[in-house]
């Protein structure tokens, strides 16, 4: 790639390597590439002139020269040999994506019920092309924005969770995304979750960057929860200050489906998280949470859009950020209640702490309501730690730095309290405390991070 216009270098790359991209993928994924290319040429990267991307220069993030593993060259490491996610009292079915390739060698026994699929997207589309075609790219069409179009154009693999009707997966499924390379690297990841009626599962995704080079990730997550399904999606980002991530999570819920999405960022460089939730069946319930702890010049940009399309649905949204040094936080959240969506209950809250004068937080909560029989609210506050509380704690013999840490931990605790896995909840509380103490560079439970 060269220093030409950011979009053009990817268009030229695809023109040169389209055959290789398709050869190392499958017909289901390849069928969407031409349309994705056309949409990317039309849309380009979102501009800071757009209100939704006002504080994040996307084109600048994509402009540098990143390497892509289009030939799917194997990474000479077995992550099962070097990686251990040590959460006490939590047993998971563990899988890995290295850069953007599902690691399909030496897979351990999955402990999954009959009919459940957890594994590579490429393999899933080959084994179950009809199911894959029904869902892949449907919640996140490439016409939605230029980053999704780019991802759809270039993605060759990813991860799938498929749970048949009436099946309950008791053991959580864990996916670890590992960035590892000797050169600056770009990865285009996909996650597809298909929950058939009255099924249940939980997915924990952990992002790690191992090496000191620059990494750039685009990630598109599509979650389909059919009638009565129950699904939890936990996204823990512990990458590095040289990692940039653009993630879009798209959730479609049918009647009585219950979906929890909780994103926690403890270490990053620049992160943009988009969340799109569609409540398309009555009595569907959505819980959308997130928090970040930022310092140095880290940036977290969160955008959410929840659509209430039918009556009697509930959504609860809570995002919090703690910013130190010159960190930047952005939150833009919109709840759309359509005319037919009577008896809607929708609540949105954004709370932020700026621990230094140099830290910046931009927040824009929004309600767009076309129904008249609803219960909706939104609220935003940005401030600093309570000096009276700090003074009181110091008067009781608690050092000021310790008092600041304890108040910061308490501020973020309600986001973690939404986690519906007790062992994971306990570990996250401890990780957040370590982060505030400055003791956490990466998850201490991982051999590869020690």
Say what each PLM segment does.
Residues 114-117, 121, 127, 131-398, ...:
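Conserved beta-strand/loop scaffold segments within soluble protein domains that form the structured core
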Residues 2-149, 318, 324:
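N-terminal amphipathic, basic helical "cap/leader" segment at the start of enzyme domains
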């Amino acid at each position: 790639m060269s220093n030409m216009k950011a979009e053009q270098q990817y268009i030229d790359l695809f023109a040169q390597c389209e055959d290789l991209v398709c050869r190392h993928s499958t017909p289901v994924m390849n069928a969407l590439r031409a349309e994705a290319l056309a949409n990317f040429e039309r849309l380009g990267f979102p501009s800071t002139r757009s209100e939704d991307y006002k504080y994040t220069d996307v084109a600048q993030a994509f402009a540098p020269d990143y390497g892509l593993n289009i030939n799917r060259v194997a990474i000479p490491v077995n992550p099962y040999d070097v990686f251990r996610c040590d959460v006490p009292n939590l047993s998971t079915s563990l899988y890995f994506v290295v850069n953007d390739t599902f690691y399909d060698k030496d897979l351990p026994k999955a402990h999954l019920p009959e009919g459940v699929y957890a594994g590579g997207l490429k393999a899933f589309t080959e084994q179950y092309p009809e199911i894959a075609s029904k869902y892949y790219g449907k919640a996140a069409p490439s016409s939605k924005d230029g980053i999704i179009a780019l991802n759809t154009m270039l993605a060759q693999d990813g991860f799938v969770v498929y749970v048949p009707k009436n099946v309950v997966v008791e053991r959580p499924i864990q996916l670890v995304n590992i960035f590892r390379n000797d050169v600056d690297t770009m990865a285009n990841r996909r996650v597809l979750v298909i929950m058939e009626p009255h099924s249940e599962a939980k997915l924990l995704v952990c992002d790690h960057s191992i090496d000191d080079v620059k990494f750039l990730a685009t990630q598109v997550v599509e979650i389909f929860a059919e009638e009565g399904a129950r699904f939890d999606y936990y996204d823990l980002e512990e990458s590095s200050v040289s990692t940039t991530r653009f993630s879009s999570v798209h959730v479609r819920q049918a009647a009585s489906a219950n979906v929890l999405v909780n994103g926690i960022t403890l270490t990053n460089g620049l992160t943009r998280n988009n969340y799109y939730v569609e409540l398309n069946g009555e009595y569907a319930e959505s819980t959308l949470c997130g928090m970040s702890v930022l310092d140095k010049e880290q940036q977290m940009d969160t955008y959410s859009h929840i659509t209430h399309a039918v009556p009697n649905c509930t959504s609860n949204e809570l995002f919090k950020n703690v910013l130190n040094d010159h960190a930047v936080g952005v939150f833009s959240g919109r709840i759309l209640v359509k005319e037919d969506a009577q008896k809607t209950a929708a609540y949105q809250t954004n709370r932020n702490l700026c621990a230094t004068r140099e830290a910046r937080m931009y927040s824009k909560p929004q309600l767009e309501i076309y129904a008249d029989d609803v219960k909706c609210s939104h609220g935003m506050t940005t401030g600093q730690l309570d000096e009276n509380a700090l003074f009181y704690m110091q008067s009781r013999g608690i050092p000021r730095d310790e008092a600041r840490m304890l108040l910061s931990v308490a501020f973020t605790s309600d986001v973690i309290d939404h986690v519906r896995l007790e062992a994971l909840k306990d570990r996250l509380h401890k990780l957040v405390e370590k982060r505030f103490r400055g003791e956490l560079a990466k998850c201490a439970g991982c051999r590869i991070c020690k």
